[in-house]
Swiss-Prot record:
Belongs to the monovalent cation:proton antiporter 2 (CPA2) transporter (TC 2.A.37) family. KefB subfamily. InterPro entries: Cation/H_exchanger_TM, K/H_exchanger, K_H_efflux_KefB, Na+/solute_symporter_sf, NAD(P)-bd_dom_sf, RCK_N. The chain crosses the membrane at residues 4-24, 29-49, 55-75, 87-107, 115-135, 152-172, 177-197, 207-227, 230-250, 268-288, 291-311, 326-346, 356-376. Keywords: Antiport, Cell inner membrane, Cell membrane, Ion transport, Membrane, Potassium, Potassium transport, Transmembrane, Transmembrane helix, Transport. Interacts with the regulatory subunit KefG. PROSITE patterns: RCK_N. Gene3D superfamilies: 1.20.1530.20, NAD(P)-binding Rossmann-like Domain. Residues 400-519 form the RCK N-terminal domain. Pore-forming subunit of a potassium efflux system that confers protection against electrophiles. Catalyzes K(+)/H(+) antiport. This is Glutathione-regulated potassium-efflux system protein KefB. GO terms for molecular function: glutathione-regulated potassium exporter activity. GO terms for biological process: proton transmembrane transport. The gene is kefB.
Length: 601
């Protein structure tokens, strides 16, 4: 692809994403499906703006590579070892059972047994990119279902290696003699990567960090990720597996969070590019001519994988609600099918349009997953939050809540306990099923659901409640809820959790005045105790704390109009100097009144 063509393709990708993804999110079908639809629109079977799909699809696999690196950073070797039974137990069982059933069904439709074996293995794999993205969106990452799902995906990545080696054998094109010297060299190279990464990565990053130049640190991170991927590809292994191992090796390092911050923007853009490329690869010509076959095959593919996954989750001991999420999020075909089915040896096994039909089925199965997960969420909402006898709004009881709490993590739990201790009627909305089940065991009135859905808020009693407390982890969810409540429930008193000053500024701009910065009060309290240990009178330390709170809040409000402007840095420095001067004057005045107590809002 020429340079000008590449630039044009980049502009088209960005334009399609900017238009399609917000529309998809507004329609409630999720960003992933928005990317896929954008790809169909600009691809060769849509408006035809881009025709070189294979090259772009190969490049866009870097999105999965970056994602696996970040996942590796979140897992240390000890945690990975604890997952070994689910990786090699549930993961292996899922691949073998799904491949056997799907391969057998392919043989009944005219596939040779060799093509059916390759097809069954390819269809048994799930989309790592889509599954992990959806698990994060649904808050499943830290749940038991999410951990089991990740284990299955990791085994599938490991299974890529023997699957690629199997295809030439089935096609009858494998060498008669195995070059054991080459195999041994690859094993030694892989072992060298593990040992070198274990002992060299941290000193190298320590040296780079000592330069104090952030851009160099970002460049080193990109070099590590892309270098690991290239090295593994040269060995004939999965690129994603290589970057995952690099991430695990750095999971316990002091640079873990800085690495994640450096990689995250690239990961998001490249993942979007990957989903757009998958949409572009959808062959609508094959779909039109074999519509019935494709429709049935997609339905069978999703149903078989869901059934296998659900049964394995039951044997593993997951709760029924988590089984459905686990089965749904892994029910699609995956990106590995594009690699496996496109091998020259594979192309000799498939007849006529068989390969194209399988790829269309895989692509469409990926498009069903966001819709399937949306349906599962609604089903679980009805099951976990049963309707009352009147048949009116689901699961609303006669004693209407006074307060709705959105999010019941550690922050939300403290608020809920305080309100319940004072006999306040609360309703809690939480989208992590494991948290819902756990809190219900302790007597909390917690309900499963995504509070950014308007109907769910209505069902929770937002029209009758007096206040809503928003404790979401994601700032985007917080601001979406604020906007929704202001538009549809203007009577509600909105109280919100702010993770830092930037989010506090956004809340102030939105008109929310009742918010709490999650670490601010606890940091002030610890600072007050530090002043006492340094010899300050307890009353004076208390007054110092109150003065600082008042002045900091004043500065927060004054800086709110310019928090996104280029003048922010100079204004912050000016405000800091002013804060120090006022603080010194106040403390000199109050030093003569050690026993006084003031209240500041």
């Amino acid at each position: 692809m020429a340079g000008s063509d590449l630039l044009l393709a980049g502009v088209l990708f960005l334009f399609a994403a900017v238009i399609a993804v917000p529309l998809a999110s507004r329609l409630g079908i999720g960003a992933v499906l928005g990317y896929l639809l954008a790809g169909i629109a600009i691809g060769p079977w849509g408006l035809g703006f881009i025709s070189d799909v294979d090259e772009i699809l190969h490049f866009s696999e870097l999105g999965v590579v970056f994602l696996m690196f970040i996942i590796g950073l979140e897992l240390n070797p000890a945690k990975l070892w604890r997952l070994r039974s689910s990786i090699f137990g549930v993961g292996a069982a899922q691949v073998m059972l799904s491949a056997a059933i799907l391969g057998g069904l392919l043989m009944t439709t005219g596939f040779s047994w060799q093509a059916a074996v390759v097809g069954g293995i390819g269809l048994a794999m799930s989309s790592t990119a889509m599954a992990l993205q959806l698990m994060r969106e649904k808050g499943m990452s830290r749940s038991e279902a999410g951990q089991l799902g990740f284990s299955v995906l990791l085994f599938q990545d490991l299974a890529v290696i023997p699957a690629l080696a199997l295809v030439p054998l089935l096609a009858g094109s494998a060498d008669e003699h195995v070059n054991w010297l080459t195999v041994g060299m690859k094993v030694l190279a892989f072992a060298g990567m593990l040992i070198g990464g274990r002992y060299l990565l941290r000193p190298v990053f320590r040296f780079i960090a000592s330069s104090g130049v952030r851009e160099v640190f970002t460049a080193a991170t990109l070099l590590l990720v892309l270098g690991s991927a290239l090295f593994m590809e040269a060995l004939g292994l999965s690129m994603a597996l290589g970057t995952f191992i690099a991430g695990v090796l750095l999971a316990e390092s002091e640079y873990r969070h800085e690495l994640e911050i450096a990689i995250d923007p690239f990961k998001g853009l490249l993942l979007g590019l990957f989903f757009i490329s998958v949409g572009m690869a959808l062959n609508l010509g094959v779909l039109y001519t074999h519509l019935l076959w494709v429709a049935v095959s997609v339905a069978v593919l999703v149903a078989v994988k869901m059934l296998v996954l659900y049964l394995l989750a039951r044997l593993y001991g997951l709760r029924s609600s988590e089984r459905m999420q686990f089965a749904g999020v892994l029910s699609q075909g995956g990106e590995f099918a594009f690699v496996l089915f496109s091998l020259p040896a594979s192309q000799r096994l498939f007849l006529h349009d068989q390969m194209a039909l399988l790829l269309v089925a895989v692509t469409l199965s990926m498009m069903t997953t966001p819709l399937l997960m949306k349906g599962i969420d609604k089903l679980l909402s009805r099951r976990l939050n049963p309707a009352d006898d009147t048949g009116e709004a689901p699961w609303v009881e006669d004693d209407k809540p006074q307060v709705i709490i959105v999010g019941f993590g550690r922050f939300g739990q403290v608020i809920g306990r305080l309100l319940m201790a004072n006999k306040m009627r609360i309703t809690v909305l939480e989208r992590d099923i494991s948290a819902v089940n756990l809190m219900r065991n302790y007597g909390y009135k917690v309900y499963f659901g995504d509070a950014t859905q308007l109907e769910l808020l209505r069902s929770a009693g937002a029209e009758e409640a007096q206040s809503i407390v928003i404790t979401c982890n994601e700032p985007e969810d917080t601001m979406r809820l604020v906007e929704m409540c202001q538009q549809h429930f203007p009577h509600l008193h909105i109280l919100a959790r702010a993770r830092g000053r930037v989010e506090a500024h956004e809340l102030l701009q939105a008109g929310v005045t009742q918010f709490s910065r999650e670490t601010f009060s606890s940091a002030l309290e610890l600072g007050r105790k530090a002043l006492i240990t340094l010899g300050m009178h307890p009353h004076q330390a208390q007054r110092a704390q109150l003065h600082f709170r008042r002045l900091d809040m004043r500065m927060l409000r004054e800086l709110m109009p310019v928090h996104t402007d280029t003048v922010q840095i100079s204004r912050v420095r000016e405000a800091r100097r002013e804060l120090e001067e006022i603080f010194q004057r106040e403390m000199q005045k109050e030093s003569r009144q050690l026993d006084g107590w003031d209240e500041f809002e």
